[in-house]
């Protein structure tokens, strides 16, 4: 069944996109939540009128994502974790840990958008973490994991 999306739907698409979905998915999930409408000549005409507004919102999102990318890549993330003498962490650094640290730095990033190489980081060192911002815009953020005891002695 062909539909037109009223709002951005994760995995499926963005507002104004024409998609082919199962009739049951449309009938039971998308339509009751007003996320999509059936594709017919009336809805197509309505979306042609709104197309300029939709494109303007998308361009603003792209611009905001590009600005956020520049700010994220310019500022390295430093995480202090307890580690043994061999540099192996007692815990692990996950996407949740990185998202929390970014929130402390003033960046609002969802945990789901943070991609940690190998899902977890378990050793002290320098890494690069990818953050998916919008469409194809991704920020590669340098992350430094330090031993917490060394970080405490440096701050004193």
Swiss-Prot record:
GO terms for cellular component: ribonucleoprotein complex; ribosome. Gene3D superfamilies: Ribosomal protein L9, C-terminal domain, Ribosomal protein L9, N-terminal domain. The keyword Lipoprotein does not apply. Keywords: Ribonucleoprotein, Ribosomal protein, RNA-binding, rRNA-binding. GO terms for molecular function: rRNA binding; structural constituent of ribosome. It comes from the Bacteria. One of its GO terms (biological process) is translation. Signal peptide: none annotated. Pfam families: Ribosomal_L9_C (PF03948), Ribosomal_L9_N (PF01281). Belongs to the bacterial ribosomal protein bL9 family. PANTHER family: 50S RIBOSOMAL PROTEIN L9. Binds to the 23S rRNA. NCBIfam families: L9. This is Large ribosomal subunit protein bL9. It comes from Treponema pallidum (strain Nichols). The lineage of its organism: Bacteria, Pseudomonadati, Spirochaetota, Spirochaetia, Spirochaetales.
């Amino acid at each position: 069944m062909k539909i037109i999306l009223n709002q951005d739907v994760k995995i499926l698409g963005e507002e104004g996109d024409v998609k082919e979905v199962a009739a049951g998915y449309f009938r039971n999930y998308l339509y009751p939540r007003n996320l999509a409408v059936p594709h017919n000549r009336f809805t197509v005409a309505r979306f042609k009128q709104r197309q300029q507004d939709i494109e303007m919102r998308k361009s603003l999102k792209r611009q905001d994502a590009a600005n956020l990318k520049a700010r994220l890549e310019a500022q390295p993330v430093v995480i202090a974790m307890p580690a043994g003498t061999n540099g192996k962490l007692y815990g692990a650094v996950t996407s949740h840990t990185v998202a929390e640290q970014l929130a402390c730095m003033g960046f609002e990033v969802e945990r789901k958008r943070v991609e940690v190489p190998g899902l977890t980081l378990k050793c002290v060192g320098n890494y690069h973490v990818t953050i998916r911002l919008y469409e194809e815009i991704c920020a590669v953020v340098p992350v430094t994991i330090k031993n917490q005891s060394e970080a405490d002695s440096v701050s004193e």
